[in-house]
A protein has these predicted regions:
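A short, Trp-centered hydrophobic/proline-enriched beta-strand micro-motif
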Residues: 107-115, 159
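N-terminal glycine-rich flavin-associated loop
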Residues: 73-95, 121
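Glycine-rich phosphate/pyrophosphate-binding beta-alpha loops
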Residues: 120, 145-151, 192-193, 360-365
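Glycine-rich beta->alpha junctions and the first turn(s) of the following alpha-helix
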Residues: 4, 184-285, 361, 395-398
Length: 399
């Protein structure tokens, strides 16, 4: 940061901490004041929770406010902070920005993502959920699936088809859905771990005000790319931006090596060191991806980080269960629980459970195969896969 930027950030943080004691007020009040001072998403424009400063300044802001006792927002607000906020500020109209951004940052609105469908996962543009205009409202019906933490969300980032006669990428529109609206039903999807972190969401003639539309009608695909770009980078960072060096899954592997490992062979020591190096390379790649994205210069790092996170996280938990040996076979229970946190990494002692949970890393947020296609076609310039539905109206595409 330049001296001028550092001075401005320091001045604003000093004012924030002088105005509001983070240990004496609730989280929403403190974060509301943080938003008003432009310290929420510091790279956003002024008036929208930012100061138009380089994104690197956010790290200094976060360090100071958390050191002063401000509570960390937690996984419940991950989707709003990492995905909905950037999507709204980039694509929303003035009224949407003023109405939703502050509530998203304070935590008054928790978000979920309503993209995938039973027949549209990797081929997201083939989604079938319909939105039909009725005056100043849209009537939306359809089904979404694999919706993380939808059961505790207030808003949903929803993409629906508004023009079935347009080609599949061109007939979509993006909405900020009220998850408490009549006609919204959330059902749990139980995982191999016993938890129900994911859900399926049924929409039955849900009425959504046109004021809750984000972006122009028919521009849903373009708007959704903003969301997906932020999602991939965030997942690459383990679900919460760039974590400290040596934290997350690799920290659990190191703990097991030091405290519980039954097989400290040279081969396993080599595996541990190689994975520590890969985890650190991934962390640095994700920092670079986040900075480039927030500066408006997104590159391939987001897809690289997402792809490598899946591979490294799975490999780390495989090493954990190998180090535990027979103890890894001891069950951890299969209790049905509606999760309130993202399950990308787990606390100490959860390696058995996380070994099973990590199997989903190469699927969620865009499969590893899709990430390789993106990198091959858009970065390396390789020819794309042949498409039979290009420029064909969605209604005419065989399904």
């Amino acid at each position: 940061m330049s001296d001028a930027t550092a001075a401005l950030v320091s001045e604003r943080v000093d004012k924030l901490l002088a105005d509001v004691d983070p240990t004496a007020v609730d989280q929403a009040e403190f974060r509301g004041r943080q938003y008003d001072l432009g310290l929420a998403w510091v790279h956003f424009p002024e008036g929208y929770g930012g100061l138009g400063l380089p994104p690197v300044a956010q790290r200094d802001i976060d360090r100071r406010v958390y050191s002063a006792g401000a509570p960390y927002p937690g996984a419940r607000h991950f989707f709003g902070l990492a995905m909905a906020g950037p999507t709204i500020v980039t694509n929303g109209d003035e009224a949407v920005k003023q109405r939703l951004l502050r509530r998203t940052f304070t935590g008054e609105d928790a978000w979920c993502q309503l993209f995938s469908e039973p027949g549209a996962g990797s081929d997201l543009a083939g989604l079938a959920t319909r939105a039909v205009r009725d005056g100043d409202e849209w009537v939306i019906s359809g089904q979404k699936v694999w919706n993380t933490l939808a059961h505790i969300a207030d808003r949903g980032m929803l993409v629906a088809r508004t023009d079935p006669e347009a080609p599949k990428h061109k007939g979509l529109t993006y909405f900020a859905l009220d998850m408490h609206a009549p006609g919204v039903e959330v059902r749990p999807l139980r995982q191999i771990t016993g938890e129900a972190e994911f859900n399926e969401v049924y929409l039955t003639e849900v009425r959504v005000p046109d004021a809750d539309r984000i972006g122009d009608v028919g521009e849903g695909w373009r708007v959704s790319m903003t969301t997906l770009m932020n999602e991939r980078t965030s997942i690459g960072g383990g679900g919460g931006g760039a974590p400290p060096r040596g934290s997350g899954a690799i920290a659990e592997a190191v703990r097991i090596w030091n405290e519980e490992a039954g097989d400290r062979s040279p081969a396993n020591r080599d595996r541990l060191m190689r994975l520590w190096i890969e985890a650190e390379a991934l962390r640095l790649t994700n920092i670079r991806a986040g900075q480039n994205r927030r500066a408006g210069n997104p590159g391939p790092e987001g897809s690289i980080a997402k792809l490598k996170f899946a591979e490294v996280n799975m490999a780390i938990y495989e090493l954990c269960v190998d180090l535990l040996g027979a103890d890894a076979l001891v069950g951890f229970g299969y209790e049905m629980r509606r999760a309130e946190n993202l399950g990308l990494t787990g606390p100490p002692g959860s390696a058995r459970k996380m070994f099973l949970r990590s199997r989903a890393n190469s699927i969620e947020g865009g499969t590893s195969e899709i990430q390789r296609n993106i990198l091959g076609e858009r970065v390396l310039g390789l020819p794309g896969e042949p498409r039979v539905d290009k420029d064909v109206p969605w209604s005419k595409v065989p399904r």
